[in-house]
Amino acid sequence: MKYKNLMARALYDNVPECAEELAFRKGDILTVIEQNTGGLEGWWLCSLHGRQGIVPGNRVKLLIGPMQETASSHEQPASGLMQQTFGQQKLYQVPNPQAAPRDTIYQVPPSYQNQGIYQVPTGHGTQEQEVYQVPPSVQRSIGGTSGPHVGKKVITPVRTGHGYVYEYPSRYQKDVYDIPPSHTTQGVYDIPPSSAKGPVFSVPVGEIKPQGVYDIPPTKGVYAIPPSACRDEAGLREKDYDFPPPMRQAGRPDLRPEGVYDIPPTCTKPAGKDLHVKYNCDIPGAAEPVARRHQSLSPNHPPPQLGQSVGSQNDAYDVPRGVQFLEPPAETSEKANPQERDGVYDVPLHNPPDAKGSRDLVDGINRLSFSSTGSTRSNMSTSSTSSKESSLSASPAQDKRLFLDPDTAIERLQRLQQALEMGVSSLMALVTTDWRCYGYMERHINEIRTAVDKVELFLKEYLHFVKGAVANAACLPELILHNKMKRELQRVEDSHQILSQTSHDLNECSWSLNILAINKPQNKCDDLDRFVMVAKTVPDDAKQLTTTINTNAEALFRPGPGSLHLKNGPESIMNSTEYPHGGSQGQLLHPGDHKAQAHNKALPPGLSKEQAPDCSSSDGSERSWMDDYDYVHLQGKEEFERQQKELLEKENIMKQNKMQLEHHQLSQFQLLEQEITKPVENDISKWKPSQSLPTTNSGVSAQDRQLLCFYYDQCETHFISLLNAIDALFSCVSSAQPPRIFVAHSKFVILSAHKLVFIGDTLTRQVTAQDIRNKVMNSSNQLCEQLKTIVMATKMAALHYPSTTALQEMVHQVTDLSRNAQLFKRSLLEMATF
């Protein structure tokens, strides 16, 4: 399966960590060449400003959906396309099994390598035009006048004298497709190697069929994925992603490799009371208090064997040992020691109020563990009667704070805003001119009700997240941002209050058709009209508030203490919690809620007596939980300073180059403006011929000859200005300048060429010879049509930037304009001298 080139927008800035990774800024538009390239899950091969490299897929967002294409007979291997074009190697296409061939026998052309592997039936012709199928773009680039369009880079012609010609690269085999070489020695992709000197398909000679039937290559051929790729797939993932190793107790062998998912292993099958104990302890987020759940534990519950389940369960869960566990009730205190509570999943114990250091440490761990838990469950858990830290909670503003890194917060906010806009759009799609009539309401009453409920739900989720961001702003030293966000939030809250009230009133009347259907126009608005009018204003207010939060995300959002910032963190956090209707809420953390608020996975069993940490010692807790996160690479100070120095030096070099480029562009702009402002002279009385033109015995009158010579000189001057403008435009395209730059240069090209059109129109009105008038008019009209084409091509190149196809089309049209302008100038000279 392959994908066509897609466009993707960068959601965040990306600083490359290796030579193959691509650097980009937030908002850049990248061309996605391949997803999950080279078997690297989550890494995409992209192109930006003429450079290619791999980028993390969770840092970009596709602008359009993926379009799959199957390997048809019209598709050719990328590495062999230009070789086939220039006759250096002949590759054969496998017919598409979905293409309904004329008969059941595949027709294969003879091999030009004379290997004799494929035997072709003698009765079938092998005409070359039937064998090779060259894409239309390549045919035009070779035989047409538009010039080559090779690879994914924009090719600009080179100016030679008063014209432009395309220069073909010297070696197409290496420079056609700008794709990094494969790191594997075997063919993983469904593309024959371009440098193969032998037969295309590696089929053993012993399997040749003399019947002339196409022999499908075995699984060991080029098209098969080598076993090493499948075998090393897990190894590749572990090298590319920083997955934590499973936690194992010292001295315990790795009895069985448990799965990656957070599901307790099924090696032990409890029955009876054991099963009851398991379900009472394994279900996180149960509504009953913790003390009540402990009462259901059987005091005679035997602990699992040390070598059977505990070791495997410890392998399945990677949770710090520093997290303390709840003690059982007083009646089961004889079983409260850690060694007899192995296998019982429990909720972490509160830290005593006087142990401040240990409490802060466990709070940090809890924030890390709870960062993906739903906020609805968090709000419900605030009434837990077993929490002793509720009296120690901070101010209300701090209770609602969002402890997220900026990238995760921005992505989550964008999803909420998009869901809100989609909900309002679906409601507006149902509102028509006669949508309140009885017939329409009878058909669409359920759809309207669903759309109203979705708008209210999405707005509620959006407000839930935004309030947390406003709470973060309240903790900043400067309150200017907080006051601004509070004003913008107030508008959205007012709208939400109106929508909630009107929705409640609509539910009170049970959405009765007799009440909602209106056959006559009336001046009074009912609840449904009021809901629609207010819902229209919500996306604009939400967009303004979202823009404010995105702009100040670095100041508003910071990870909480103890949280980890991984490169693929945003994707993993966003996918950890799902909400109805596609919404996702931000996690609001309450310092006193971490007891009743359970994990999405069961907690590990208590540690054995030899390995159980001292719950009364905060120092031991600090030491133990740090050991469990030793897989996190902490960058040293020297390495960090060295990288920062390199980045600063690179940034300074880029700034200097940018300043030099901007200075050159500014001077070029000024020169072009001076040339453009020069008008076309119409006063022939002040004109003196620059050179003596040869006279002939043709029927051209002296007055027409003088006019042709006069405007030929004018055309020569403005033609040079046109070439200078084209040079500036091609320079912008070659340096990958944005649309605002090359569009401005294209205007100079159009204005310069328009002066030539003006000269042609003036000559058409002033010359007396009919044949000369017709020739000048035809040439002038051709230039005018070419200008219209350039305007459209420039517009498409700007709209589809950075599409190389659109840019290349603009370059082709401008090149054609230079040729037509040169022909127009030459025709004036010919008509004046012959």
UniProtKB/Swiss-Prot annotation:
Biased amino acid composition, Low complexity: 369-395
Protein's gene: NEDD9
Subcellular location: Cytoplasm, Cell cortex; Nucleus; Golgi apparatus; Cell projection, Lamellipodium
Phosphothreonine PTM positions: T804
Subunit relationships: Homodimer. Forms heterodimers with BCAR1/p130cas. Forms complexes with PTK2B/RAFTK, adapter protein CRKL and LYN kinase. Part of a complex composed of NEDD9, AURKA and CTTN; within the complex NEDD9 acts as a scaffold protein and is required for complex formation. Part of a ternary complex composed of SMAD3, ITCH/AIP4 and NEDD9/HEF1; within the complex NEDD9/HEF1 interacts (via N-terminus) with ITCH/AIP4 (via WW domains); the complex mediates ubiquitination and proteasomal degradation of NEDD9/HEF1.
Protein name: Enhancer of filamentation 1
Compositionally skewed regions (Basic and acidic residues) per UniProt: 332-344
Region listing for Divergent helix-loop-helix motif, in residue ranges: 710-760
Interacts strongly with spindle-regulatory protein D1M1, as annotated region: 102-229
Swiss-Prot/TrEMBL induction comment: Induced by oxidant stress in pulmonary artery endothelial cells.
Region of interest (Required for interaction with PLK1), ranges: 710-834
Spans annotated as Disordered: 238-260, 291-316, 328-398, 560-623
GO cellular component terms, semicolon-separated: basolateral plasma membrane; cell cortex; ciliary basal body; cytoplasm; cytosol; focal adhesion; Golgi apparatus; immunological synapse
PTM annotation (Phosphotyrosine): residues: Y92, Y164, Y166, Y177, Y189, Y214, Y223, Y279, Y317
Polar residues composition-biased segments: 306-315
The record's note on its domains: Contains a central domain containing multiple potential SH2-binding sites and a C-terminal domain containing a divergent helix-loop-helix (HLH) motif. The SH2-binding sites putatively bind CRKL SH2 domains. The HLH motif confers specific interaction with the HLH protein ID2. It is absolutely required for the induction of pseudohyphal growth in yeast and mediates homodimerization and heterodimerization with BCAR1/p130cas.
Keywords, ordered alphabetically: Cell adhesion, Cell cycle, Cell division, Cell junction, Cell membrane, Cell projection, Cytoplasm, Cytoskeleton, Golgi apparatus, Growth regulation, Membrane, Mitosis, Nucleus, Phosphoprotein, SH3 domain, Ubl conjugation
Region (Interacts with CTTN): 351-834
Outcome reported for the amino acid change (mutating T804D): Reduces interaction with PLK1. Abolishes interaction with PLK1
Region feature (Required for interaction with ITCH): 1-505
GO biological-process terms attached to the record: actin filament bundle assembly; cell adhesion; cell division; cell migration; cell surface receptor protein tyrosine kinase signaling pathway; cilium disassembly; cytoskeleton organization; integrin-mediated signaling pathway
Domain of life: Eukaryota
